Curated annotation (Swiss-Prot):
GO cellular component, one term: plasma membrane
Protein family according to the UniProt entry: Belongs to the major facilitator superfamily.
Source superkingdom: Bacteria
UniProt xrefs under SUPFAM superfamilies: MFS general substrate transporter (SSF103473)
Lineage: Bacteria, Bacillati, Actinomycetota, Actinomycetes, Mycobacteriales
Cross-referenced InterPro entries: MFS, MFS_dom, MFS_spinster-like, MFS_trans_sf
Protein name: MFS-type efflux pump MSMEG_3705
Summary of the knockout phenotype: Deletion mutant is more sensitive to capreomycin, more resistant to rifampicin, and accumulates more ethidium bromide in the cell than the wild type.
Record carries keyword Membrane: yes
Chain segments annotated as transmembrane: 21-41, 59-79, 86-106, 115-137, 150-170, 181-201, 228-248, 264-284, 299-319, 327-347, 361-381, 397-417
Job of this protein: Probably plays a role in bacterial growth and resistance to antibiotics.
GO molecular function: transmembrane transporter activity
Length: 429
């Protein structure tokens, strides 16, 4: 490692101590869980919302997928610029308050258009929280130890899936989907003061070493790095599959396996939570260990994970047994959560400290923009097949698209690894 590179990687003289840093990671994981709970609610409650507001599968796909994620992607970069000044806690707390408030307002909507407007507000609020959390980790953990805390934060996704399916599903079944929105949103608003207390309002950033040319690690320069562009292509396909599963799996189980909303919440919610958390912890820890030998393992581990679990993405829509179907869906869903921690850790090594939140936001921008196409296409294909296949149309659409998108994503990650090491070395030039 050259001197300039060492200067970039050891910018932690003013970092939080291990106890506080891990406590903050725990709080950020809780925030992330609420982030995804509020994001997943319309998907979990898609069936009652669809019937109450008289929406089509295409409309559900646009509101929960394309429309939400486009706003999320664009605003993420804008808010991340504030976080890059060290205002990690302030950004997260402000975003938390906004999206919680907008989720509560979602319980009062009377049309699909009004629901879409509240989801725009949720998207704006959630946009800045994740990049700020990633930047906090990069600021307070050395490069070889970032995948584990990032994995803990990313555990929010399967935990949120379980919480939204269990909590949201059971609340909706007993009190109605509108009440579920109000209660879940209120929990987010209440948590904001804890973020300011543990994470802090802002944290000072190190001065960039004089020997380093800032343009070499600038976030704009990511667009000229082959490894970043190919990883972006890979995450586009993997996230498209993941968002499709998130949006339509509950509806698929209810339509084709005869499950009630409460049963989906308990069985599918617990399965995705348990498998997702286990997968993230294993992948995050393993990625850190392997990356010490070769940083390309941050990408290779995504390839390995996807190929090992890929058969589940086919079997989930073929097997008739209800429990096997739930198990395979949860395994397929785990691809779309476990790959994030090593991917983000890889991206963080391509930029300077003051550009990390923006780099993370750029990654999530492409993840969201291209990933949002998945639910939209699945919804349209399902609607087009309904006349011929009836209730089986949604399952057929998912069968045709999910595994194919995941496979293409794995191929992209493999191709990106060929250039990744060189792109890191360029930071020292």
């Amino acid at each position: 490692m050259s001197a300039p590179q060492a200067a970039i990687d050891t910018d932690h003289a003013d970092r939080h101590g291990p106890r506080r840093a891990w406590a903050a990671v725990g709080v950020l994981a809780l925030v992330g869980t609420l982030n995804y709970v509020d994001r997943f609610l319309p998907s979990v409650l898609a069936e009652p919302i669809k019937h109450d507001l008289e929406l089509s599968d295409t409309a559900i796909g646009v509101i929960n997928g394309f429309g939400f994620l486009i706003v999320y992607a664009v605003m993420g970069i804008a808010v991340a610029r504030v976080a890059d000044r060290g205002a990690f806690g302030a950004v997260v707390a402000g975003c938390l308050t906004l999206w919680g408030t907008m989720t509560m307002l979602g319980g009062a909507v009377q049309s699909g258009f009004q629901l879409a407007l509240t989801r725009v507000g949720v998207a704006i609020g959630e946009a800045g929280s994740t990049p700020a959390a990633h930047a906090y980790v990069a600021r307070n953990f050395v490069p070889q130890r970032r995948s584990a805390p990032l994995a803990v934060i990313t555990i929010a996704i399967p935990l949120a899936s379980t919480a939204s399916l269990l909590g949201g599903g059971l609340l909706a079944q007993s009190l109605g989907w509108r009440t579920a929105f109000v209660i879940m949103g209120a929990v987010s608003v209440v948590l904001a003061p804890l973020v300011l207390l543990v994470v802090g309002v802002r944290q000072s950033l190190p001065a960039a070493p004089a020997v380093v040319d800032k343009t070499a690690g600038g976030w704009w320069n990511l667009l000229r790095k082959p490894s970043f562009l190919i990883v972006v292509a890979g995450t586009a396909f993997i996230s498209a599959a993941g968002y499709s599963l998130t949006t339509f799996s509950p509806a698929f189980l209810m339509r084709t396996r005869g499950m009630s909303l409460g049963e989906v919440g308990v069985e599918y919610g617990l399965a995705t939570g348990a498998i997702g958390v286990l997968g993230l912890l294993i992948v995050g820890r393993l990625a850190d260990r392997l990356a010490e030998r070769d940083p390309r393992w941050l990408l290779w581990i995504v390839v390995t994970l996807t190929l090992v679990l890929l058969p589940a993405s086919v079997l989930a829509f073929v097997v008739e047994d209800r429990m096997l179907c739930v198990l395979f869906l949860a395994l397929s869903y785990a691809i779309g959560t476990s790959y994030l921690a090593p991917s983000i850790a890889a991206i963080q090594r391509l930029v300077l400290p003051e550009q990390r939140a923006t780099a993370s936001a750029m990654f999530l921008f492409f993840n969201a923009v291209f990933g949002s196409v998945g639910p939209f296409v699945v919804g349209m294909l399902s609607d087009s097949l309904t006349d011929d296949l009836g209730a089986q149309a949604l399952g057929r659409a998912l069968l045709l698209l999910v595994a194919a998108m995941q496979l293409v994503g794995a191929i992209c990650y493999w191709l990106a690894s060929a250039r990744y090491r060189r792109d890191i070395i360029e930071e020292a030039r």
